[in-house]
Amino acid sequence: MLSTEMPLPTTGSTLLKTPASPSPNQNLLPLTAVINKNGELEIGGCSVPALVEQFGSPLYILDETTLRQAAQQYRQSFQAHYPGSSQVIYASKAWSCLAVVAIAAQEGLGFDVVSGGELFTTVSALKQLGWDEAEIAEKIYFHGNNKSVQELQEAIAINCTIIVDNWLELETLTKLAADSGAPVKIMLRLTPGIECHTHEYIKTGHLDSKFGFDPNQLEAVFTYIAQQPSLHCLGLHAHIGSQIFERQPHKDLGEVLVQWFTKGLTYGLPLTELNIGGGLGICYTESDDPPSIEEWAQVAAISVAKACDRQNIPYPKLIAEPGRSLVGSACVTAYRVGGRKVVPNIRTYISVDGGMSDNPRPITYQSVYRVALANRMNDEITETVTVAGKHCESGDILVKDVALPAAEPGDIMVVAATGAYNHSMASNYNRLGRPAAVLVNQGQANLILQRETYTDLLRQDCLPNRLLS
């Protein structure tokens, strides 16, 4: 799209919502983002161009204040709107590293993990914080549709709750639990058959999904578990998808889950927990309009409470699993601008020093982002360009047709809302090292992920001796 074919905003400051929404997921940039006296983007009291100068690029910049406020809003919202007990657990697949786990733990969150690696990372962080074995066991929930025997054994060893996804896993756990000599805590994941409007790849609640037990399997599952003294079934779980703006699907989910929860009680199962998953969306563009954290929590909490009242059952412990809406808006990625290519009457390309290896979402989900020049936030916007990554791949486009000042080599470009599923989905494509990440707060910047070096890229390589002869 040519710059003459669309109205251009005035400056890069349009990324800053004024006033900022108190709910982090409703902003493009972190809550602490401002433009300083030099016309530079500042986050957490730190100049973004100065951070790039110190730590290099590409660079993930995570704002501690935004992450903490999102966590606090989730906890406070469920406490305010749900009459029973509640627990917010962080869906660590969004971004799993020691520092993010530590912050979430300090804010009273539990953890949803989906692999042995995420489990190891979470347990490592919690031990460094001084948590004991009982605290760790209580706060971790292990997900996944194809957990290995080794992963199940690791989960059993720390006594965390395992969310069972299918018959094979259930039967495997029965044997492993018997071998361990102690009951294993489980929950059941069901597929509720609820549709929501989001990308096909991140829908999980409709019937045609790889996750969970279908409703027509549940009574047989209840019967089986009731006969297994080694399995202690705490409750039910469902997750209907991600990046959801609608309220109705989670209202419906609460009602469906409570119906099956009530049914499970009639089989004598000691159900006490109900896990509604996550899915609240965030702003990636100005036109995105997700509910606030409190609005989402209120809808879900009231739906479950009213359904329990209708069924005349005690309120179960209500669990929610936000991921994207906790970390997504708390982070930006900074790049250095490189070359320019002008295709007359078609498109202007601006290349940066990262791309699909540090943010695969555009090529995977056709995700749309907003960008600005962090060193020239007040400069007049003059053109529409397409931001290209540096990979040997035609599809390596970070943002299409975005309005910017005339970018020059060495400018610092930031992509907004990159906290979720950027670092966690990053790769070494074209043998690029994964970027560093810094945590910023009140003018202080701390490295939380080191930049991978060439040596790191070879760390797992093996060269057989026979190839050297």
From Swiss-Prot:
One of its GO terms (molecular function) is diaminopimelate decarboxylase activity. Gene3D superfamilies: Alanine racemase, Lyase, Ornithine Decarboxylase, Chain A, domain 1. Residues 1-23 are annotated as: Disordered. The active site is at C392 (proton donor). InterPro entries: Ala_racemase/Decarboxylase_C, DAP_deCOOHase_LysA, De-COase2_C, De-COase2_N, De-COase2_pyr-phos_BS, Orn/DAP/Arg_de-COase, PLP-binding_barrel. Substrate binds at R324, R361, Y365, E393, Y421. Pfam families: Orn_Arg_deC_N, Orn_DAP_Arg_deC. Pyridoxal 5'-phosphate binds at G279, E321, P322, G323, R324, Y421. Its EC number is 4.1.1.20. It comes from the Bacteria. Its cofactor is pyridoxal 5'-phosphate. Pathway: Amino-acid biosynthesis; L-lysine biosynthesis via DAP pathway; L-lysine from DL-2,6-diaminopimelate: step 1/1. It catalyses: meso-2,6-diaminopimelate + H(+) = L-lysine + CO2. SUPFAM superfamilies: Alanine racemase C-terminal domain-like, PLP-binding barrel. The modification N6-(pyridoxal phosphate)lysine is found at K93. It is an enzyme of class 4 (lyase). GO terms for biological process: lysine biosynthetic process via diaminopimelate. Belongs to the Orn/Lys/Arg decarboxylase class-II family. LysA subfamily. PANTHER family: DIAMINOPIMELATE DECARBOXYLASE, GROUP IV DECARBOXYLASE. Specifically catalyzes the decarboxylation of meso-diaminopimelate (meso-DAP) to L-lysine. This is Diaminopimelate decarboxylase. The gene is lysA.
